[in-house]
């Protein structure tokens, strides 16, 4: 698969990254280099290799699954810069 300048421009737009027209060829080349590396990774034989999520084997400690109300609301809200009616109060961020 090869990325041309128009596809690179589309990817930049979708990622909300402003890219000048004169930088599009370099961006397309970077994308092609990344895709080439991914194609190399696809050639690696991983048959029989267990998937890893960590470089060190870990087992999480188990505990009884007990439903509680937590009883921590007042302690948690004391750390809040602004709490109202038992909830965190934050500035509006979406119009």
Curated annotation (Swiss-Prot):
Which organism encodes this protein?
Answer: Jannaschia sp. (strain CCS1)
Q: Which UniProt keywords apply?
A: ATP-binding, Ligase, Nucleotide-binding, Protein biosynthesis
Q: Which family does it belong to?
A: Belongs to the GatC family.
Its Enzyme Commission number(s) read: 6.3.5.-
Identify the coding gene. gatC
Q: Does the keyword Nucleotide-binding apply?
A: yes
Q: Is DNA repair among this UniProt entry's keywords?
A: no
General function of this protein: Allows the formation of correctly charged Asn-tRNA(Asn) or Gln-tRNA(Gln) through the transamidation of misacylated Asp-tRNA(Asn) or Glu-tRNA(Gln) in organisms which lack either or both of asparaginyl-tRNA or glutaminyl-tRNA synthetases. The reaction takes place in the presence of glutamine and ATP through an activated phospho-Asp-tRNA(Asn) or phospho-Glu-tRNA(Gln).
Name a biological process GO annotation.
translation
Q: Molecular function terms in GO for this entry?
A: asparaginyl-tRNA synthase (glutamine-hydrolyzing) activity; ATP binding; glutaminyl-tRNA synthase (glutamine-hydrolyzing) activity
Name of protein: Aspartyl/glutamyl-tRNA(Asn/Gln) amidotransferase subunit C
Listed under subunit, the entry gives: Heterotrimer of A, B and C subunits.
Reactions listed under catalytic activity? L-glutamyl-tRNA(Gln) + L-glutamine + ATP + H2O = L-glutaminyl-tRNA(Gln) + L-glutamate + ADP + phosphate + H(+); L-aspartyl-tRNA(Asn) + L-glutamine + ATP + H2O = L-asparaginyl-tRNA(Asn) + L-glutamate + ADP + phosphate + 2 H(+)
Q: Which Pfam families match?
A: GatC
Q: Which domain of life is it from?
A: Bacteria
| SUPFAM superfamilies documented for this protein | Glu-tRNAGln amidotransferase C subunit
Q: InterPro entries attached here?
A: Asp/Glu-ADT_sf_sub_c, GatC
Give disulfide pairs as residue numbers.
Answer: none
């Amino acid at each position: 698969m090869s990325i041309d300048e128009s596809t690179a421009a589309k990817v930049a737009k979708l990622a909300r990254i402003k890219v000048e027209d004169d930088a599009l060829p370099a961006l397309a080349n970077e994308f092609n280099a990344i895709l080439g590396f991914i194609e190399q990774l696809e050639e690696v034989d991983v048959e029989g290799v267990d998937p890893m999520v960590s470089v060190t084997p870990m087992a999480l400690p188990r505990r009884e699954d007990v439903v509680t109300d937590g009883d921590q609301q007042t302690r948690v809200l004391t750390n809040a810069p602004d709490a109202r009616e038992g909830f965190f109060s934050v500035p509006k961020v979406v119009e």
